[in-house]
Amino acid sequence: MTLFSTLLISVASLLLGSGHATLVFAGDAMQHQSQLDNARRPDGSFDYSHYFSAIEPYIKSADYAVVNLETPIGQKGYSGYPMFCAPAAYAKVLGDAGFDMLLTANNHTLDRRDRGLRHTYAILDSLGVDHIGTYPSPA
C-alpha cells in the first residue's frame, strides 16, 4: 500500500463519522547537535518533553497528524548534521505530542546505513508509533 492510499483510507474513515476532517502535516523533525546537547541529561538519558509543548494542542486537536522524521533513530553515537542520528526518546516524544504517523522516506533515511534503517523501523514499532516510507527488507 502506498503512503497516499494509506492516508486516503485514514481520512475517508474520519469523514464517514463527521463529514469533515482536520489534518496536520509537519516536518522536518530532525536533531541538530545543539538540540541533542540541550536534551541530554547528566545520567545520559534524553528529555524532549518540552520540545513540542507550544504546538502540541494544535497537533492533538487534529483528526490526523503526520510528520516527516528526517533522522534515523539509532543507538549510541547520536549526531546532528550532516549524518543525523537521534535517540529513541525523540521518536517517543513525537508520538506523545500527538503525531499519528511518521514518514521515514527522505534523504537522511540511510545516514546510519542499512543497520540504522532497520533499527529505526524496530524502534518505531516497539514504541507503537505508526510509520510509513521505509521497511527493513524489500518484501
Regions found by a protein language model. Name each.
Residues 4, 11-139:
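Acidic, metal/ion-coordinating pockets
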